[in-house]
Regions:
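A short, glycine/acidic-enriched catalytic loop
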Residues: 15-25, 78-105, 109
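Active-site-adjacent mobile loop/cap segments within catalytic or ligand-binding domains
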Residues: 4-9, 13-18, 72-82, 120-183
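Mature extracellular/periplasmic domains of secretome proteins
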Residues: 58-69, 129-135
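Loop/turn elements at helix/coil->beta-strand transitions in domains of secreted/extracellular proteins
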Residues: 2-5, 43-47, 67-72, 113-117, ...
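Active-site histidine-acidic residue metal-binding/catalytic motifs
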Residues: 1-60
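Long, well-ordered alpha-helical scaffolding segments within enzyme catalytic domains
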Residues: 31-39, 97-115, 153-181
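Extended alpha-helical stalk/coiled-coil segments
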Residues: 185-231
Length: 234
């Protein structure tokens, strides 16, 4: 089977400042995309294309259409006073489009991890999102959460890995690929491990010292008792 091709399009909106954290929508979306791109390439052999922060919308659409990916995923965060995730898809009345299927997979994964109620799958055509309308690939635009809400913003900053994993799982589901979990992290903080080991050794040594002292005291009591018995007998 030919390798799947994905175009990742993190936000290029440099002026959209997060309400906390001193970071922009563009920066955060790219940090999530960095993790996602690595996972798709290394774990599944997916061909990943990506926009550049210097591109404008027309250039992004043109670049995606030239690359001809299977899917185009625009990764954004939202503003306007709300909370939660919403996904924009190419919706056609009376028909379930591939864009809608992809949007549903992504929305399902984000609904599990977001800290508030989410906002549903919406029509990217009526919203006039060029990346949904004018790309030739199956396309969605994802608003992960609201960067003008303090709680959503803090969540976005703290959960980039979780957001990437949500995209990864959804893309796997759409392509019919088995999701591969990341291995559990192995500690490489040898100094910390050594400190913990030394602490445990010291604790055991202290317990042994206490036991020896108690045994010595019991032995002394026994010897005195034996001496008393001998004195009585004699």
């Amino acid at each position: 089977m030919a390798a799947k091709k994905v175009y990742l399009s993190p936000s290029t909106q440099q002026a959209n400042l997060f309400v906390v954290g001193g970071i922009t929508e563009e920066q955060n979306s790219n940090l999530v995309t960095d993790i996602l791109e690595k996972a798709l390439r290394n774990k599944y052999g997916i061909t990943v294309y990506r926009n550049s922060p210097s591109m404008n919308l027309s250039q992004i659409i043109a670049d995606s259409n030239v690359k001809a990916p299977d899917i185009h995923v625009a990764i954004h965060s939202n503003a306007g006073g709300g909370r939660g995730c919403e996904v924009y898809a190419y919706l056609i009345s009376g028909k379930v489009t591939n864009s809608q299927k992809l949007a549903q997979y992504i929305y399902n994964e984000f609904s599990i991890i977001t800290p508030s109620a989410d906002r549903g799958i919406k029509n990217g055509i009526t919203a006039n999102f060029g990346e949904v309308i004018n790309t030739t690939a199956t396309a969605v635009l994802v608003e992960m959460a609201f960067h003008d809400n303090p709680d959503d913003t803090a969540w976005l900053i703290a959960n980039r890995q979780a957001c990437s994993t949500a995209f990864e799982k959804a893309i796997c589901s759409y392509f019919g690929i088995a999701y591969i979990p990341d291995p559990l992290p192995v500690s490489t903080d040898y100094e910390k491990l050594n400190r913990e080991a030394q602490s445990q050794i010291a604790s055991l040594q202290s317990q042994l010292t206490t036991i020896n002292q108690e045994l010595t005291a019991e032995k002394d009591k026994y010897n005195k008792l034996v001496a008393s018995i001998k004195a009585l007998i004699s």
